[in-house]
Amino acid sequence: ASNLQEWQDAMNMRSIISFNGIYADKEGNIFFIHNSSSPKRLEGLDWKEVVDGSRSKYIWNDYVALNEIPQILNPSSGWLASTNQDPFKVSAPSDNLKKENYSATLGLQTRMTNRAYRIKELFMENNKISEIDFDNFKFDNSYSKSSRSYKYVSTIFDKEFEEDKLIEGQKILKDWNLKTDLSNKSAALGVCVLSPEWLAEQEGIAPPDTEEVFRDCVYDLSLIHI
């Protein structure tokens, strides 16, 4: 494809059945599509549950048209960011699509990743972005205070501990600037505590008890540094 129309025509072939796409060209166009080859399903059913496959009206035979799946062209904010997140939170709030305008049968994800929160924060905090800024955004290694990870870690902040090591570990977490660069001495404990939550989310199970994870991390890291 050499222009936006050709790119959209290529996407309309539906050869790529998944994977979000963001397009940009020398003309200044930017375009987001929450790409999918989604079945055209009967409305009014919870398709996450078991559906009676013996009834013909529940059997789908076609795909939802490309223009019926979430997409944004040239938002006024001037930016788009897609990092495996809610397709209704890929630009500034004034430019985002409205969930109620799309069929619930699409089964669109609503999760937000830490990367999604961070890139949104970085774009929203900066009205003008240089090429250097853009590179820094790309390689940002911070956790967002809006992320599940931070909310999980922060449950440790108000707990009362008696052991000196746990009190010290709690202070390290409270003082952590949420960055994970090589020289960040707090990152080891922070990432150790939040990692089980991330793994649990990936597996679709409840996260483990934060205090137990914190205790294990503090003592495991203490042994490493003896």
PLM region descriptions:
Residues 12-15, 158:
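N-terminal cationic-hydrophobic initiation segments that often serve targeting/anchoring roles
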Residues 18:
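Segments that shape or occlude catalytic/ligand-binding pockets
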Residues 2-13, 119:
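Alpha/propeptide regions of enzymes that mature by internal proteolysis
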Residues 25-224:
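Long, compositionally biased non-active-site segments enriched in small/hydrophobic residues and glycine
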